[in-house]
C-alpha cells in the first residue's frame, strides 16, 4: 500500500514502533517539505517547508523535467534541463550533456538538493545543460532496461544520448544542435570520451574526468557484474 502519495521523490524514516514515519519529499522543481505521518498514510503534522526565498532573490529558477524517446523509438527516457537564470528564448544556446550511464544508477536528479548545483553553475556560463537516463541505466526501471548494456559497457548508452539531444533541438529553437558537448566523471568520463570518438561529427567537445577507459584494468567486481567475465582460461585454469 502506498502511504506517501504524490508524484515526488521521497525519503522516509520510520519510528521504532512503526506507528509513524517522517516523510521528506520534493522534485527537482518543487520546494522540499517534511511531514510526520502515521501508518495509515494520514498526515499527523506538517514539520517543515524549506525556505528558498533568499535563493529566488538571487534570480534562481527551478530546472525543468522532460521525457523523450530512446534511439529505439519506443522506450521512454526521463531527464532534467537546466537553463541560465537570464534565459532568453530568442537566443541560441550550446547544449551540454552531463552523463553517468550506470548501470547501477543514472546522473538524473530526482529531488531538490545541493547536488544540482554543479549543473546550475554550468548553465550560468551560457549553456543549456541536460541530464537523462539511457537504456542500460537504473535498475529500478526494469530488468530489461538495466541489462541492456550487459557485455557492452562502452557503447550501450551513446545512441540514446545523441538521439535525445536531436529531439530536444527539434522541440526548442533555442538549442544549437551544431554546438553539443558532453562531460562526466568516472563512468561519465568513460562515456564522454567514447561519445566523441564514436560520434565526432556530433559531439564537438568532450571533457572526461577520472574515466575508467579500460574496464579490464578497473575494479573487477564492478566490471564483472555489469560486463561479464572477460578472462579466458586454458585447460590448466
Question: Language-model segments: which ranges?
Answer:
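Serine-hydrolase catalytic core recognition
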Residues: 9-237
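Surface loop/turn motifs at the tips and blade-to-blade linkers of beta-strand repeat domains
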Residues: 3-7
Amino acid at each position: 500500500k502506498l502511504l506517501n502519495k504524490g508524484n515526488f521523490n521521497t525519503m522516509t524514516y520510520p519510528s521504532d514502533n512503526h506507528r509513524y514515519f517522517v516523510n521528506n519529499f520534493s522534485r527537482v522543481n518543487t520546494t522540499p517539505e517534511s511531514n510526520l505521518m502515521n501508518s495509515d498514510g494520514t498526515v499527523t503534522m506538517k514539520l517543515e517547508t524549506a525556505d528558498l526565498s533568499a535563493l529566488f532573490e538571487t534570480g534562481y529558477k527551478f530546472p525543468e523535467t522532460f521525457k523523450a524517446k530512446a534511439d529505439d523509438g519506443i522506450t521512454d527516457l526521463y531527464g532534467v534541463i537546466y537553463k541560465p537564470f537570464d534565459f532568453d528564448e530568442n537566443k541560441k544556446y550550446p547544449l551540454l550533456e552531463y552523463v553517468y550511464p550506470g548501470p547501477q544508477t543514472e546522473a538524473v536528479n530526482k529531488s531538490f538538493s545541493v547536488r544540482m548545483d554543479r549543473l546550475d553553475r554550468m548553465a550560468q556560463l551560457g549553456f543549456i545543460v541536460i541530464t537523462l537516463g539511457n537504456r542500460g541505466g537504473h535498475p529500478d526501471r526494469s530488468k530489461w532496461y538495466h541489462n541492456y548494456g550487459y557485455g557492452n559497457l562502452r557503447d550501450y548508452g551513446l545512441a540514446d544520448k545523441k538521439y535525445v539531444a536531436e529531439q530536444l533541438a527539434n522541440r526548442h529553437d533555442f538549442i544549437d544542435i551544431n554546438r553539443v558537448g558532453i562531460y562526466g566523471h568516472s563512468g561519465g568520463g568513460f562515456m564522454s570520451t567514447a561519445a566523441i570518438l564514436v560520434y565526432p561529427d556530433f559531439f564537438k567537445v568532450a571533457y572526461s574526468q577520472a574515466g575508467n577507459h579500460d574496464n579490464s584494468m578497473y575494479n573487477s567486481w564492478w566490471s564483472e557484474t555489469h560486463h561479464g567475465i572477460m578472462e579466458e582460461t586454458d585447460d590448466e585454469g
